[in-house]
């Protein structure tokens, strides 16, 4: 039986967790890594210039330049250790003008676990605005950027992003092989 479904369906995110565990054996929820959150901490890495460019672009967007509040990257939605990758479950608030700005500044050769052009279009179509606090959109876009780009420095597969409303995730049954395979096919497509 499908639970009551809505745009902010908690059962959908729970089902994604169950499917990750069924597919990969284990997944961590709200997992934290000790990865720095400030662009200058990456100056001597392959991402240094890109992260400086993205943080600058976010600061220029609305003039909110002090949006990086945490010394470390906040927890990710899901972390699968084998093979190592992060999965983020993006609800509508992730598709903002700030996120579009960040995505537009990604290096052209970066490998992503989601369709970049589609995510950009979702940002244009949804145009979410969350001004509480005033720089919330910039913060969210920055931390999403770190979760997209930094894992590669640590040997991870690309971060997979699922749009919460692209599918009724709670309609899947994590106990059935058919739905496990259906979910796995989505992940494999994103990780190509």
Residues covered by each model-derived region:
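Nucleic-acid endo/exonuclease domains
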Residues: 1-192
């Amino acid at each position: 039986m499908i639970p009551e479904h809505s745009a902010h369906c908690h059962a959908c995110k729970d089902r994604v967790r169950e499917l990750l565990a069924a597919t990969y054996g284990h997944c961590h929820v709200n997992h934290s890594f000790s990865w720095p959150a400030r662009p200058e901490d990456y100056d001597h890495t392959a991402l240094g210039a890109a992260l400086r460019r993205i943080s600058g672009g976010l600061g220029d967007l609305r003039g909110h330049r002090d949006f990086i509040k945490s010394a470390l990257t906040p927890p990710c939605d899901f972390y699968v250790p084998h093979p190592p990758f992060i999965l983020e479950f993006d609800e509508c608030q992730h598709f903002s003008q700030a996120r579009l700005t960040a995505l537009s500044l990604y290096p052209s050769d970066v490998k992503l676990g989601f369709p970049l052009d589609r995510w950009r279009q979702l940002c244009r179509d949804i145009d979410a605005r969350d001004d509480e606090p005033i720089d919330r959109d910039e913060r969210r876009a920055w931390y999403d950027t770190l979760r997209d780009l930094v894992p590669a420095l640590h040997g991870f597969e690309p971060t997979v992003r699922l749009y919460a409303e692209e599918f009724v995730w709670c309609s899947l049954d994590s106990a059935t092989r058919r739905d496990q395979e259906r979910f796995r096919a989505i992940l494999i497509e994103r990780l190509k």
